[in-house]
Amino acid sequence: MLRVAINGFGRIGRSVLRALYESDKRDKIEVVAVNELSQPEAMAHLFQYDSTHGRFQHKVTHDQEYPYSDVPDSSQDKVRILHQADLSLLPWQSLEVDLVLDCTGVYGSKSDGEKHITAGAKKVLFSHPGGSDLDNTIIYGVNHDTLLPEHRIVSNGSCTTNCIIPVIKAIDDAFGIDSGTITTIHSSMNDQQVIDAYHSDLRRTRAASQSIIPVDTKLHKGIERIFPKFSNKFEAISVRVPTVNVTAMDLSVTINTNVKVNDINQTIVNASRCTLHNIVDYTEAPLVSIDFNHDPHSAIVDGSQTRVSNGHLVKMLVWCDNEWGFANRMLDTALAMSK
């Protein structure tokens, strides 16, 4: 049994714990503690009632001994709540923590990870892109087989790298990619304003519900980290749109082989049934973004939107639940790190 602690109980931290209870991994992973600076009452309430993913299927309570406890079925699973701002003072050693899932979105450097190690954790997995000095960056389904036992401080990439990189790999393996561009159409996030208010990014001073808002992205750097051969070959832009969840990615690539639409789509279908099973899905149904809410795949390719120009320029539409799909990959990578 892998003993896990979650640091940061926001959108991803809560989704990871919920995903564990909806998965077949509860006999492999035990969450023993959550570190979060907010109050236990708010933590329990937000875990029980979620505007995006609905009510948690079991009753959630909190008490003094175990300020957070979840009660599934007839047994009681108890998870310790901590409120420690200093990572090096967390009681990971006494709790015998094997792996910390750092879901704060704040920490991501090797030195941050070392603080968890100093506190007694054996390994750390960041839920966001980390520095180049980390032991590894994993996009599960693409390079998780590169994990080594000595890799202690690892990044799980981002929701968008987990969405687009498996698709890039499938197309590149089949036809060879020369270069590409990506537009990320991302749902609003909590670093945006409800109404116009001050922010260091002037575009993000504007109300999230009123505009499509361009934001900076380093997605191309994430692609280069996994595929060094694509250095200076990809560029990306990103916009936030007034929805609460689910992201669409507009991928355009130039390929070395002359292809037709069916060639591209069949490649994705084949990958979804074999090498990328449970990672990439495929659909041609006339769906919209909300239909992908709570989808556990990293990516869902909408084959009805695939286009090919002049045999070599390929455009694809790829969906993902940027919370739920990524949370499920955190669990997959956690287990891969335990081997």
Curated annotation (Swiss-Prot):
GO terms for cellular component: cytoplasm. NAD(+) binds at residues 11-12, 322. Its EC number is 1.2.1.72. Pathway: Cofactor biosynthesis; pyridoxine 5'-phosphate biosynthesis; pyridoxine 5'-phosphate from D-erythrose 4-phosphate: step 1/5. Signal peptide: none annotated. Transmembrane segments: none annotated. It is an enzyme of class 1 (oxidoreductase). Its main location: cytoplasm. Keywords: Cytoplasm, NAD, Oxidoreductase, Pyridoxine biosynthesis. Substrate binds at residues 158-160, 204, 217-218, 240. GO terms for molecular function: erythrose-4-phosphate dehydrogenase activity; NAD binding. It is found in: Cytoplasm. The active site is at residue 159. One of its GO terms (biological process) is pyridoxal phosphate biosynthetic process. It holds the Pfam family Gp_dh_N. InterPro entries: E4P_DH_bac (IPR006422), GlycerAld/Erythrose_P_DH (IPR020831), GlycerAld_3-P_DH_cat (IPR020829), GlycerAld_3-P_DH_NAD(P)-bd (IPR020828), NAD(P)-bd_dom_sf (IPR036291). Belongs to the glyceraldehyde-3-phosphate dehydrogenase family. Epd subfamily. HAMAP family: E4P_dehydrog. Catalyzes the NAD-dependent conversion of D-erythrose 4-phosphate to 4-phosphoerythronate. This is D-erythrose-4-phosphate dehydrogenase. It comes from Aliivibrio fischeri (strain ATCC 700601 / ES114).
